[in-house]
Every structure is written in C-alpha cells, then in structure tokens.
Swiss-Prot record:
One of its GO terms (biological process) is translation. It comes from Arthrobacter sp. (strain FB24). GO terms for molecular function: small ribosomal subunit rRNA binding; structural constituent of ribosome. Keywords: Ribonucleoprotein, Ribosomal protein, RNA-binding, rRNA-binding. Belongs to the bacterial ribosomal protein bS20 family. One of its GO terms (cellular component) is small ribosomal subunit. This is Small ribosomal subunit protein bS20. Binds directly to 16S ribosomal RNA.
Length: 86
C-alpha cells in the first residue's frame, strides 16, 4: 500500500476508471454480439440497426479513451463487412 497521499488518491481513481472501462467494454461486446446474431439470422433490418448502435458505442469508447481509434475502426470494419455481405 502506498504511503504518499497523491498515490493513495491515484489508487482510488485508477480503480474507478478500471470499473468504468470494464463496463464500457462489456457493453461493446454485447452490442457486437447483437450484430453477429442478427447477421446469423439473416435479418437485414435488425443487423443494420444493431450496426448503427454498435458503431455509436465504439465511437463513444474512443472519445472516452477506453479504446484506441484504430482498434475501434478495425472492429467497425469487421462488423460492417458482415452486415454488407447480407
């Protein structure tokens, strides 16, 4: 355990950030899973709607600093290819 006051504060803020980041990543996985299930069921409308929602969540994660912009771009590209293949 840290003895320095600023380090004690950093431990608390890092834990808050870790929990927040894990929650955002979990939402992303759920959104991408929704796109994949819609693609598997060959439902174009549901897949398109899920793609929009997932893209929005990926962009939000980038703006919050949870994901790198290239990582989000790769994920969006992958799910877009699946939806466009329908």
């Amino acid at each position: 355990m840290a003895n320095i006051k600023s380090q004690k504060k950093r431990i608390l803020t890092n834990e808050k950030a870790r929990l927040r980041n894990n929650a955002v990543k979990s939402e992303l996985k759920t959104a991408i899973r929704a796109v994949n299930t819609a693609v598997e069921s060959t439902d174009k409308d549901a897949a398109a709607a899920a793609l929009v929602a997932a893209s929005r969540k990926l962009d939000k994660a980038v703006s919050k600093g949870v994901l790198h912009k290239n990582n989000a771009a790769n994920r969006k590209s992958a799910i877009s290819k699946k939806v466009n293949a329908l």
